[in-house]
Amino acid sequence: MTESERCKMPNMTIKDIARISGCSVSTISRVINDRPDVRPETKEHILQIMRESGFVPNTNARQLKIQQSRSLVFVVKGTRNLFFSDFLVQLQRAATLYGYSGIVSYLDENANEIDAAEKILREIKPKGMIFLGGSVTNFQKGFANITVPSVLATLVSDELDFPNLSMVGVDDRASAHTAVAHLIAQGHQKIAVLGGPATSFPSRMRRLGAQDAMEDAGLRFDDTLYGLSNYDFESAYHAMNGLLAKRAEFTALFAMSDVIAVGAIRALVSAGLRVPEDVSVIGFDGITMSRYCVPVITTIVQPSEQIALQSVELLVRQIEHGAPAQTVTLQPELQPGESVRPCRGNF
């Protein structure tokens, strides 16, 4: 396409830039946000196309004027979930790139997200909804009443099947298997686990993944080494203290979130134990805080930017083109830190 042809294209979008450049939407997003993980020649190629086409990200006056008619609602279940806090930044950015504004609705962990969504639909009338977290049971019972295109982000379940509900996330069971297998590879056999109850789908899948890894290694999953914790610092701190009070013997801990890992590490240190010298700890999520803890937490990183972009892209396709719902499972990454070391025996 020549420069003159590009200049004739009105209302260019990020999808147009991706198509013309031959790059992915996520790559265009990284260039717009001046991310360093783009090759210089690719970045210059994309910027040249933007200059020639007169493309400007959708933060101009025209976009603000139509913002109300192009709104999405992000229903966040869990006010203290730091992964969701990090993820929301990516989600808002992705929505803006596609020309939509995001309205955030925070709910307590025990709230019914479907009831809240029905109320939002009556009051705001958004074009679509993205749920961050949720109860599979609540969706099974009430999602049929949600009439707008929707996406369940960070959770993928084969127990849900609705024509207007896409899902984007990682395989929680396989990801937990990776985490615990990493501990086992370091020689750990007595592994404690901190996570939520079986009524929580992610917690249930992550527990099964931990069990799978231990069984694959010929080890027994010890139910007495499982501590119930919400996904917040205080709950994790008390859950770890509960395990320590029972004089449970373990050399490693799989925490079902980085927040749980931080709370647990604080309890271990308060009890006079060292991480990782006495107890190795691996987390889950890859939140920013995990990289600034002492020690740096070894964790399973959920690709939050990819999840956000895929979630918004699927939602926009449903809204603008009537596309069918899809399920997208993305691959997490084991990010080594300083909180895991080879086993040296029980503490």
What are these regions (language model features)?
Residues K125-G133, A192-L194, Y226, R247-S257, ...:
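Periplasmic-binding protein-like
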Residues K77-D86, V104-E113, L155, M167-T178, ...:
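Hinge/beta->alpha junction and helix N-cap segments in small-molecule ligand-binding domains
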Residues M1-Q67:
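N-terminal helix-turn-helix DNA-binding module of bacterial transcription factors
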Residues M1-M9, Q67-A181, A245:
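Alpha-helical recognition/docking segments in bacterial nutrient-uptake
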Residues A239-F347:
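Flexible loop/turn connectors
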Residues S24, R70, K127, H188-K190, ...:
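Short acidic/polar active-site loop segments enriched in Thr and Asp
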Residues Q189-K190, F221-L225, V275-S280:
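Short acidic capping loops at alpha-helix termini that bridge into adjacent secondary structure
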